[in-house]
Amino acid sequence: MDIRKIKKLIELVEESGITELEVQEEEGTVRISRAAPVIAPAAVQYAAAPVVAPTPAAAPAQVPAAATTAPAASDELSGHLVRSPMVGTFYRSPSPEAKAFVEVGQSVKVGDALCIVEAMKMMNRIEADKAGVVKAILINDGNAVEFDEPLIVIE
């Protein structure tokens, strides 16, 4: 392959933003790949992470209040704990305008929707794995939840 063709292919890769190009001709094969653009966006994402960190720093004022309530509640409450199957954001209703899936004192059957945990823009419906009466909802709407964190108590 002619060196001028190869130079034009390199220019094409640089201008178009594609990361890899492979051309086969009778004379041979040329593969041009760029790894630098993949690294640059990752660095930008990591640079954005500290910006997110100060936002939760404002939230600790709320977290201690919730943390104080949750241990006291779990000490007093007995029953079946419905736990979060993933890290995400807890929602009591399918949308902000909609009615909550369940309220304290409400009877639930196995398979009834209790809440939603949003993870990576996916709404994951959490269902009752035991029939009974909702005794307590341990998380406030819109709060972050950790994996295996108790969400709801069913008795």
UniProtKB/Swiss-Prot annotation:
Keywords: Biotin, Fatty acid biosynthesis, Fatty acid metabolism, Lipid biosynthesis, Lipid metabolism. Transmembrane segments: none annotated. GO terms for molecular function: acetyl-CoA carboxylase activity. Pfam families: Biotin_lipoyl (PF00364). Residues 72-155 form the Biotinyl-binding domain. GO terms for biological process: fatty acid biosynthetic process. Pathway: Lipid metabolism; fatty acid biosynthesis. One of its GO terms (cellular component) is acetyl-CoA carboxylase complex. The modification N6-biotinyllysine is found at residue 121. It comes from the Bacteria. The keyword DNA repair does not apply. Homodimer. This protein is a component of the acetyl coenzyme A carboxylase complex; first, biotin carboxylase catalyzes the carboxylation of the carrier protein and then the transcarboxylase transfers the carboxyl group to form malonyl-CoA. This is Biotin carboxyl carrier protein of acetyl-CoA carboxylase. It comes from Haemophilus influenzae (strain ATCC 51907 / DSM 11121 / KW20 / Rd).
